[in-house]
Amino acid sequence: MLVAGRALRPADLWDQPLIISHQRSDDRRLAQWMQRDLSQLHIVATYNLVFNASLLVDEGLGYALCFDKLINTRGSSLCFRPFAPRLESPAYIIWKKYQVFFKAATAFLSCLKQLTEQ
């Protein structure tokens, strides 16, 4: 069982059942942070949608590695613990070059642009 209320270090996760993203773009970064090759870890499942990973965690299958605030944990048995040292990964938003957006999508992109310029 992982200690509640504190950040997780690589050694805390070495022998734990892990659920990781199916996307392979961050494997090298994760392995470097974990100080282990991914083949040395106890990976019990991978996911494409973090919501599906949350269902596996809720059933006690393992611990999902994911970005914070993707799953609303309020009122559930799930909780988020940050990594120490911090592990960061870039994220990208892409769209068609001449895409016509609805008002909501235009407002969303405008907010994203403002946030990334700060």
Task: Enumerate the language-model features and the residues they cover.
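Short beta-strand-to-loop elements that line the ligand-binding cleft
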Residues: 20, 39-52
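Residue-level "edge-of-site" marker
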Residues: 26, 47, 69
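Active-site-adjacent beta-strand anchor residues
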Residues: 20-21, 46, 64, 94
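Generic structural signal for secondary-structure transition and capping sites
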Residues: 1, 18, 61-62, 117
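Secondary-structure junction motif
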Residues: 2, 10, 16-39, 101-105
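Beta-alpha-beta core module
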Residues: 6, 12, 51-100
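Extended ligand-binding regions for polar small-molecule ligands
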Residues: 94-118
